[in-house]
Regions:
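Acyl-donor-binding surface of acyltransferase catalytic domains
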Residues: 1-8
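Acetyl-CoA-dependent GNAT
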Residues: 7, 13-17, 24-99, 103-105, ...
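Structural motif
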Residues: 25, 126, 148-149
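Conserved beta-strand-loop-alpha-helix junction that forms the acyl-donor binding cleft
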Residues: 107, 133-143
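Conserved G/P- and acidic residue-centered "switch" motifs that form tight phosphate/ATP-binding loops
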Residues: 110
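Residues forming the Rossmann-fold NAD(P)(H) cofactor-binding site
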Residues: 113
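Conserved GNAT acetyl-CoA-binding A-motif
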Residues: 123-134
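Conserved catalytic-core motifs of GNAT/GCN5-like acyltransferases
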Residues: 132-135, 147, 152-154
């Protein structure tokens, strides 16, 4: 398995200045595979807001829920190129990975796998017995990645 350093990136903790770029990455990466987009296609904009607005708000919720569960991927040039969000329900013994995304030119390099492994290691260190990640059926890339790591469809 490649390390982040060999790929030319650094994994670091989330900083408040990352919020807007992470939202932009999210909206771009989730086009075609977002439940919010599917809902908009079925029902139109909801309450006057498009799916991109709703999806970006998921990042606000992730930051509010567990800011320490966010890892950011930064290129050697200091550009944020991807991220993962996670949170832990220690009472239930479950860790959640709600969002994982990269800018297009950084996809397919194994970084998503590395981020998920880091998060799963954190979950295990916290004594969690299960992890949950969700995706739509049309997200072939996500399905392949998640099952190759050991997630099972339920």
């Amino acid at each position: 398995m490649s390390s982040a350093e060999h790929i030319g990136v650094t994994f670091r903790s989330y900083q408040p200045g990352d919020l807007e770029v992470i939202k932009r990455i999210t909206v771009e990466a989730f086009s075609g595979v977002s439940i919010d987009e599917a809902a908009e296609l079925a029902f139109g904009p909801i309450n006057g807001h498009d799916w991109q607005w709703r999806k970006a708000r998921h990042i606000d919720a992730d930051v509010a829920r567990e800011v320490d569960g966010i890892l950011v991927v930064e290129s050697e040039q200091g550009e944020v190129v991807g991220y993962i969000t996670s949170w832990q329900d220690t009472a239930a013994g479950i860790g959640y990975i709600p969002n994982l995304a990269f800018v297009p030119e950084w996809r397919g390099r194994g970084l998503g796998r590395l981020l998920i492994q880091r998060v799963l290691d954190r979950f295990r260190a916290s004594g969690l017995s299960h992890a949950k990640i969700e995706t739509l059926a049309q997200n072939d890339v996500g399905h392949h990645l998640y099952t190759s790591i050991g997630f099972r469809e339920v």
